[in-house]
Amino acid sequence: MTVVSVEHALAGKLPEGGEVTVRGWVRTLRGSAGLAFINVTDGSCFAPIQVVANDTLPNFDEIKRLTSGCSLIAKGVLVKSQGKGQSFEIQASGVEIVGWVEDPLTYPIQPKPMTPEFLREVAHLRPRTNLFGAVTRIRNCLAQAVHRFFHQNGFNWISTPIITTSDAEGAGQMFRVSTLDMVNLPRDASGNVDFSRDFFGKETFLTVSGQLNVEAYCLALSKVYTFGPTFRAENSHTTRHLAEFWMIEPEIAFADLAEDARLAEQFLKYLFRAVLDERGDDLAFLAERVDKNAITKLEAFINAPFEQIDYTEAVKLLQNSGKKFDFPVEWGLDLQTEHERWLTEEHIGRPVVVTNYPEHIKAFYMRLNDDGKTVAAMDVLAPGIGEIIGGSQREERLDVLDARMAQFGLDKEHYSWYRDFRRYGSVPHAGFGLGFERLVVYVCGLSNIRDAIPYPRAPGSAEF
């Protein structure tokens, strides 16, 4: 007897009347006149499959006691369903109960609406819900599409280090990695912590970005990307921030900001097309329960050409909008989410690429423009969320890079390896970063980024 996934059983590609076996968990059960109708899910798709068990089965009394969350193996004949809302069902010839729910009344995942706040408290069980099953499958679809896009376009995937000595953003919000005894810290003659006695012989941190490391491979392999975990010790209790998240960071050699922006547009549209093509069932659920525009916003995003405007122009548009914003709009200040959303939703009505930001509000590695006041940086803004991608052309001129590092108070000797790229065959190059969880939030219409990752890490929260 063939073991199949629920998705495969419901797809209509198996012979009707054939014998199959499915393995999964009970979503719901109802009984009627010697019959038990068991909705079984294995996580392979949004819909469950109905298993119909009758009272001729030797363990029918056991079957009737099944509750949500119990695990089972059902064998039987695959037939077209007579009921509404399902294409096929299984007429069971046997139901083996693998695992019971210890106390159904206290089982946290009940077949009823539950708030995201409650589900964060039981994050180890929340993938069993409709919502987080859908989010997880979409997250997986996006991750697979990321690698597929870059592979098809000739990029090499680079594994950048998680433990590092460099602050790629220059912001200093890094988690320290140490094996020193926190109670009896070794001190040097000046009374400072002696990190020479630490595991690596120096002060080390969790990475905030793989960009600096991946640039090394860009300047040898031309087109590369990294996709991995990053960490920010930013004490932000917001719906938009995580302490641990995943970043996608491509880097392209012999490229300027315009080419970087084109890559970002192609990339996002490819990802959204993949989700529409592969996860329609999950998107339909999200459109019904979470974000009514879950499908239409992705279709609109794919079909709309990106608008590109200069930061200075964006500031003028905002100042002349007549709208009262919570945050001030002035040249030299970074754009806030409310400003970004006004540009994309109320003024332009489609994705926007804002370019050429003031040099003092962007990172040291971004290429200084000829005006000396702005850098070749870009933010891709999406309706409904604001910034979704941040990128730039990198500073390839050693003297200018050194001046920028001095401006930011960075020790150029500490970054000597990064400076080497400008000393040995330097070329113009560019790249961007996309926070993967922010992408999941946008696609799924979630209101809190802590629901876009299996086990959220945030200030004061590191459970499981």
Swiss-Prot record:
| Chief place of localization | cytoplasm
Q: Which residues cross the membrane?
A: none
Which InterPro entries does the UniProt record give?
Aa-tRNA-synt_II (IPR004364), aa-tRNA-synth_II (IPR006195), aa-tRNA-synth_II/BPL/LPL (IPR045864), Asn-tRNA-ligase (IPR004522), Asp/Asn-tRNA-synth_IIb (IPR002312), NA-bd_OB-fold (IPR012340), NA-bd_OB_tRNA (IPR004365)
Hey, what's the signal peptide range on this chain? none
Species lineage = Bacteria, Pseudomonadati, Pseudomonadota, Gammaproteobacteria, Lysobacterales
Task: Name the gene behind this protein.
Answer: asnS
Q: What is this protein called?
A: Asparagine--tRNA ligase
Tell me the enzyme class.
ligase
Q: Which domain of life is it from?
A: Bacteria
Assembly, per entry: Homodimer.
Q: Name one Pfam family in it.
A: tRNA_anti-codon
**Which keywords annotate this record?**
Aminoacyl-tRNA synthetase, ATP-binding, Cytoplasm, Ligase, Nucleotide-binding, Protein biosynthesis
Q: Name one GO cellular component term.
A: cytoplasm
- The species this protein belongs to is Xanthomonas euvesicatoria pv. vesicatoria (strain 85-10) (Xanthomonas campestris pv. vesicatoria)
What GO MF annotations does this protein's record show? asparagine-tRNA ligase activity; ATP binding; nucleic acid binding
> Which reactions fall under this protein's catalytic activity?
tRNA(Asn) + L-asparagine + ATP = L-asparaginyl-tRNA(Asn) + AMP + diphosphate + H(+)
Q: Name one GO biological process term.
A: asparaginyl-tRNA aminoacylation
Subcellular localization is given as: Cytoplasm
So what family is this one in?
Belongs to the class-II aminoacyl-tRNA synthetase family.
Tell me its EC number(s), please.
Answer: 6.1.1.22
